Amino acid sequence: MCDMIESQPAQKIGKMKKLRRTLSDSFSRIALKKDENAIDEICVTKMSTRNCQGIDSVIKHLDPIPEDKKVRVQRTQSSFDPFEKTSNQPTSPKFGKADSYEKLEKLGEGSYATVFKGKSKVNGKLVALKVIRLQEEEGTPFTAIREASLLKGLKHANIVLLHDIIHTKETLTLVFEYVHTDLCQYMDKHPGGLNPENVKLFLFQLLRGLSYIHQGHILHRDLKPQNLLISDTGELKLADFGLARAKSVPSHTYSNEVVTLWYRPPDVLLGSTDYSTCLDMWGVGCIFVEMIQGVAAFPGMKDIQDQLERIFLILGTPIEETWPAVHSLPHFEPERFTLYGPKNLRQAWNKLSYVNHAEDLASKLLQCFPKNRLSAQAALNHDYFSDLPPRLWELSDMSSIFTVPNVKLQPEAGESMRVFGKNNSFSKSLSNSKH
């Protein structure tokens, strides 16, 4: 089942501002290093999720921070490096420099970030530039620090690659691989439910990426179709780690204001902050149903109360026998909810019955009681995937599932396969983060 990740104690606002200011300074100083290798090590406070080591002389300017609070986040390696030089190219701008990229059209804008399509001046390859505006008093937004630090340590075919970090006085720019579309756009383009074989491949990739980060004690916390990027070859990649949380990442508290309402689990809706990997697995179940059925599983129209009613109408209103200690949750008031019994999922989403083992898998993901939800690794071993080639379970982290012979997306209803289109998903998945 799911793994628990303990909440961190609340931090005082003053201390958090000081921390953000210090980390902002560290980004700035690293960005100004003359040694191009210096940018490969970003010093952050309590943010690494793997391969933590001591801090060397490259970043001695952070000595005021206690040694036990310092960790290193390694630069992600990938098959595509925007600074990979071809033989006929002259010396180009350094790693971590703004003039290494050309901004193309704007793709999207959020409260604190604007996303541009960009191009590496070294080799002409496309990138996505997430430009985060900095405020003098606040420094680098904490969610930006979190996203950058986590992604720098993640190496997986189903996680969007962070290639570069550029820090100036006014902005922090995260340079991502360019991905053509996202699952939300893909489903909009193919209404009525996706090809069942494609659903299986998308879900398998989603679970691969989640299993990887969960093993590193990282929660994504904002799973939704807009945050699942899809390349022109069909690779699905987890994106927008602005709300992601590592076990060692400090914060004011674990907020329950995470995950778009439709994909938010009932325990979080009821005020629980005792998060585990189960939080993400509820989102997986919602996305799975949506891909098959062609409509959102629980499309609440009003508020949290309405969202919970939609969930309980299908899964049953929780009681102590089905959800131990549910009455202890901050927002659980039994008198507010109609008492429903659980239904077979096919009664609500009939297309689940068309695919072998789909209803069973969905039912094991969409469990109101968090501890009853399947883990990502357990879901990968479900019978629903039994007809896929065994080699898929033997792939290395950085290997795409499409390297396995005969694994490919199938045409959607009424269409032959083609490149998904030019619309880039970063306009939603990156600029709509909490930065």
UniProtKB/Swiss-Prot annotation:
Domain Protein kinase: 101-385
Localization per record: Cell membrane
Major subcellular location class: membrane
Residues reported to bind ATP: 107-115, 130
Active site per database record: 222
GO molecular function: ATP binding; cyclin binding; cyclin-dependent protein serine/threonine kinase activity; protein serine kinase activity
Membrane disposition: Peripheral membrane protein
Keywords annotated in UniProt: ATP-binding, Cell cycle, Cell division, Cell membrane, Kinase, Membrane, Nucleotide-binding, Serine/threonine-protein kinase, Transferase, Wnt signaling pathway
PANTHER family assigned: CELL DIVISION PROTEIN KINASE (PTHR24056), CYCLIN-DEPENDENT KINASE 14 (PTHR24056:SF154)
Quaternary structure and interacting proteins, as annotated: Interacts with ccny; ccny mediates its recruitment to the plasma membrane and promotes phosphorylation of lrp6.
Name of the protein in question: Cyclin-dependent kinase 14
